[in-house]
Every structure is written in structure tokens, then in C-alpha cells.
Amino acid sequence: MKHIRNFSIIAHIDHGKSTLSDRLIQTCGGLSSREMQAQVLDSMDLERERGITIKAQSVTLNYQAQDGNTYQLNFIDTPGHVDFSYEVSRSLAACEGALLVVDAGQGVEAQTLANCYTAMEMELEVVPVLNKIDLPAAEPERVAEEIEDIVGIDAIDAVRCSAKTGLGVDLVLEEIVARIPAPVGDPDAPLQALIIDSWFDSYLGVVSLVRIKNGSLKKNDKIKVMSTGQVWGVDRIGIFTPKQVDTQGLGCGEVGWVVCGIKDIHGAPVGDTLTQAKNGAEKALAGFKKVKPQVYAGLFPISSDDYESFRDALDKLSLNDASLFFEPESSTALGFGFRCGFLGMLHMEIIQERLEREYDLDLITTAPTVVYEIELNDGSTIHIDSPSAMPPVNNIKEMREPIAECNILLPQEYMGNVITLCIEKRGVQTNMVYHGNQVALTYEIPMAEVVLDFFDRLKSTSRGYASLDYGFKRFETSEMVRLDIMINGERVDALAIITHKENAQYRGRQVVEKMRELIPRQMFDIAIQASIGNQIIARSTVKALRKDVTAKCYGGDVSRKKKLLNKQKEGKKRMKSLGRVDVPQEAFLAILHVGKD
């Protein structure tokens, strides 16, 4: 056991985690040079296309150290995006140490900090690594000082390497062996294995990634899932050397995968403990804290026949992605679908793309909302996550919206722009600290403003240099209203949005204008209105197409023309009272992007 090292790699987006893991795999000979490709661990097409890591991946490598011993390194590559921080905390729970990778050109960024603090709270050994030192813009000395100044860990002797060229990677491996402690555990105690991740394989059933804390696990053992009490036999067991390799068993302190023939998707929840069926462990390991979704949106299949397969797809996806929440919902405009909860807008986009690709579905999304707390006149408190669930205005005593605490790290020269942006988003500054050339700003901004497009706007005002980390702080009383969109006097429930009273007029006008462009012209006028309660705050009209009925008259009496025009008028009137307007697909999507341009 003393030759095992478990660690994860944490870093900000694009600081080179996945490339460094490629080099580690190559140096330790995990894959032959023929099988090697860039970002081996980003196994989803989506990850490769966007160049981001979404799922944490684990690998077991054997490394011959300079002291002559062979060490077993189990490492987990983690995502850097703020929406996927729960993946990071899960990975860290299975480790004794973490490599903190910092780009020697960019320096410390907000996500580096957030993930690093998570690691320190879990009492892991944090080993700083300065990456990308082959770049002309690299300033390892300045960045090392920055790490000491902002993060507060000793970084004078931080390893300098370039994951791209492979320079200094052997030093990184030596540091891992020297500084990260070996796992602690009792090989003879009853089995306790923590499920770090699970996914569904259509041939094998549920495959779980586990970290053995105490005891050991062998093929054909009978094991019990502690939360459900169900007993399963271990069919296959093994490790990833990125490829799935079968072994006879896993010892104490090791990380590997287990297949028990579980067909039920909720049979092995993430964060659960496995133990032996006979003489098992008394109590389960401390799992992970459940993450609460921050953004809710309705997802509806375009054709109602897809509803069943859509539900299966969500079931399978939620096994792999523990933070996805969903419940059935129906809408008069869109039929049956699900209300889904996500951690942020990126998470929502990724889930939607995964559903469309991996499960071949066509979906419509409604405008995302956050969770509001409402105190009613009778003194009870409710939480709502969709505009249609909002009670009538006269029953509401007060409405509270969620406030997020945002930590923003940025170079000084962009400070003006970023502060202006935060004020525009109704933010309140609570702290500001200078670290050399960097400024750390802390703002309290309403969650609804943060999740919508704050991240994109922040990146564009600071030319990509500012970085953001946010978390839910509290609920605060605020004047929120429900903005309804009416088409020819009928409310379209899927287009309703909850917004702040100050922005309501502006949002209403924007949505109405956007709708006017997108709804095709009919033979009669279509009135598009935005209303709050019974008060109309914006209106625009899609003008009717009309046929020139008098074209066939030439000269002659004017009463003939009048007769034809009046006949047309009658027809239009009847059409208007009977006509129905179909809202096209683009109109629902346009709501998501209102106010971006």
C-alpha cells in the first residue's frame, strides 16, 4: 500500500490539465504511441469539440521512480469549469493529494482558487505545478509569487514543466511520489468502497468507479450497496489504463471499476458505499453533499411520440451526471416534457447536446429560471422554479430572489469595465483586494443575472482575462414580476419569464420585437403583447397580408370596389376571431437569447 498514490489534477479552464495527463500516461507507458491521441481522457465527442473536460476520468499507471521502486499512480483528470465543480469535489474525495496546475503565462485565476480551497478543506496535499513554461509569455517567477500571495501555499520550489513538449514531466512524477502521502486504510477490515462515479453501459449494465478505503474486493465476491441494501455478485472488476482492463481484484487504497450486473439505473448511486454481503462494515462512508440545481428550464420533445424515449434518456444521463434533476411537466403550448434543474447555463447546453446526440432526440427548451422563495399572505413559504407555478399577485406577501456571491479575479486595466457590468447586473460590491497586478473583486449579484449571460459578458468586457467563481449565498427580498407574452389575447405559457420590475419594460419590449420578426405573417393582424398581471406594457403587431381584390375592376362605378373591399373586411374579421397562430420553434429559442445583442 505504501507504493500507491492517489491524486487529481485541478486547474482553471485551459491551463493544460488534460494535456498534462496525456504526458503522464505517455511517460508511464499506459498506451502505445500508436493509440496515443491528444486529450485521451476526454472521451465524449462533445468534450473534444469544445476542448473542455466535462466528466472526471480516472487512470491507473505504474511508474518506476528514481528510488528503484515501482509506484501505482491512480489519477483523476477533473473539469475546470465552474458549472462542473461538483465533479471536482467528488474526485477529490477519492484522493490524498492534488496537482494544482497553473499556466505560467496567465497566472492564478478564480477557478484555480475555488478548486484549491476545496482541496484544502478536504485536507489534501496540494502540489503546485507551473505549466506552459515553453511559451514566450511565461513568467514562472511572477506566477510562483502570485500562488504564494493569493492561494497561500509554498511555491518557490514548484515544478516547472511544459505538458505540450514533455519538458519536466518526469520531475512532476517525482514530486507526486515524494510529496503526496500514501493512502491510509486497513486491508483486513471489512470492505468499504466509495462509488465516485457511475455510468450505464448497454451490455454490462451499471459500471461504477470505486475507491477502496478499507478491505479489498475480488471477483465473484458478494457485495451489498449500503443505501439500498441490495446484494450483488461482482461479475467483472478492473482498472483503467485509459483502456478498461480486467483484473482479479482491487486492494486497499486502489481505484478501479466494478460491474455487478445491476440493471436498475438507481441501483448504485454516486457517493454510496459498497461492503461485503456477510460481515460487512457497520457504517457507510461520508458521501458527497448533494448539489442543488441553480437553473431550471423546461425541456420538451418536438414530437410527442418521443416522450418515453426522452424519459429513458434522462434516466440514463442522471446516473452519469449526479447533479441533473428532472420532474414531469406539461405545457399547453408544448405538450408533455420535463422540468430539469442544472448547475448553470453551460451545464444546460451540454445536457441538451448530449440528449440530442447520444439519444437522437429533438428538443425545445423554455427560458431558464432560478428558484425563487415566496412568502404568501397566510404566512407559508413556497419555492418555485417555473413562471407558471407563480401564485396570483394578490396572494404574495413578498418575493425573495437568490443572491450569488461572485469572486472575480482580473488584471487591473479591465477593472472599470467589469465594475460597470456588475452594477448593470444589480450587483453590490462587498470586497476588493489587490495582489500585484491582479485584483480580486467580490460581488453579490442576483443569481438570475449570473446564470443568464454574465459569464459571456464578463469574458468579452475583459478580453478573456477575468475569471469567475460563484456560489449561492442567500435569498433576499426583491420586486420580481411575471412577464406574460400574449398572442392575439391568448397567453403562451412557455414564453412567460420572471424578471425584476425595473427590467420588465425593457425585457417586454425586446421579447415583443423579437417575436414580431419571427412569427410569420398571416391573412389577419396578429397582436403580440407583453403584460404584467392585467397591465399591458409593450405591444407590436404583425401586419396582415392582403390580397388585392380590386385588381380586376377597371374604371366603372366606385360602389363595385366598395362592395369587394367590404366583403374582404368581413372575411378578415371572421378569420381574426377564428384564426389560430402557430408559434414557430425559433421563437422559443429566441427568448433564451433576448438581451444578448
UniProtKB/Swiss-Prot annotation:
GO cellular component: plasma membrane
Keywords assigned by UniProt, alphabetized: Cell inner membrane, Cell membrane, GTP-binding, Hydrolase, Membrane, Nucleotide-binding, Protein biosynthesis
SUPFAM superfamilies on file: EF-G C-terminal domain-like, P-loop containing nucleoside triphosphate hydrolases
One Pfam short name: EFG_C
Domain tr-type G positions: 2-184
Catalytic reactions on record: GTP + H2O = GDP + phosphate + H(+)
Binding site for GTP: D14, H15, G16, K17, S18, T19, N131, K132, I133, D134
An annotated GO BP: positive regulation of translation
Function description: Required for accurate and efficient protein synthesis under certain stress conditions. May act as a fidelity factor of the translation reaction, by catalyzing a one-codon backward translocation of tRNAs on improperly translocated ribosomes. Back-translocation proceeds from a post-translocation (POST) complex to a pre-translocation (PRE) complex, thus giving elongation factor G a second chance to translocate the tRNAs correctly. Binds to ribosomes in a GTP-dependent manner.
Stated family: Belongs to the TRAFAC class translation factor GTPase superfamily. Classic translation factor GTPase family. LepA subfamily.
NCBIfam families registered for this protein in UniProt: lepA, small_GTP
Name of the molecule in the record: Elongation factor 4
Native source organism of the sequence: Aeromonas salmonicida (strain A449)
